Amino acid sequence: MKSIAAVVAAGLAFAASATAANAQISDDVVKIGVLTDMSSLYADATGKGSLAAVQMAVADYGGKVKGKPVEVIVADHQNKPDVGLNIARNWYDNDKVDAIFDVPTSSVALPISALTRDKNRININSGGGSSDITGVACSPNTVHWTYDTYSLSNVAGKAMVKRGEDTWFFVTADYAFGMALERDAANVVKEAGDRKSVV
């Protein structure tokens, strides 16, 4: 929970910066949406804990940014990209949310990042881990504050290549994070030389 609180504190500082001033603070209230998983497989790791961390960070920051009060709302994206995207679109278009935080699971995080860019708002992603968030889908409106598949695959992959492993088999989770992890790990192995075999 402390790491989420640190993310929110950094996000609040970001929102107060001149760069973030270009993304409008609407209605004289800084409205933060915690878009998290409250009911699916990431609920225990995020969910209520993420909401509590955001609330603690807002309190620690004094409840204001640039003299404007901070309001926190929360929604459950149910680990479903369409549900998450509909919530985020409604928040930006109707509820005047200025920033979305958390967003566990890459399959939800990627479309939220794209929408955030289109709406010129702020997305502090501490939940999705696909390297595509800061790679092919990179956005100036999204801060990726977590591990990613590039770092995970490079640490483990390079260590195993150095140890002499020469044949690799992947059992891959069939979703955005799993596919990105396999791709990034396979690239590590291929970059190690022709003697390596990826199956």
Annotate each PLM feature.
Residues 1-21:
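Gram-negative bacterial Sec-dependent N-terminal signal peptides
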Residues 20-34, 63-70, 161-166:
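Immediate post-signal peptide segment of exported/extracytoplasmic ligand-binding proteins
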Residues 29, 45-50, 60, 64-136, ...:
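Beta-alpha junction/loop-to-helix N-cap segments that form part of ligand/metal-binding clefts
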Residues 29-47, 104, 166-171:
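Short beta-strand segments enriched in small/hydrophobic residues
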Residues 41-52, 176-180:
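Glycine- and acidic-residue-enriched helix-capping/strand-helix junction motifs
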Residues 48-56, 140, 151:
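A general alpha-helical scaffold signature found inside nucleotide-binding enzyme cores
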Residues 53-62, 182-187:
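Short, well-ordered amphipathic alpha-helices
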Residues 96-196:
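Extracytoplasmic ligand/sensor domains, especially the bilobed periplasmic-binding protein
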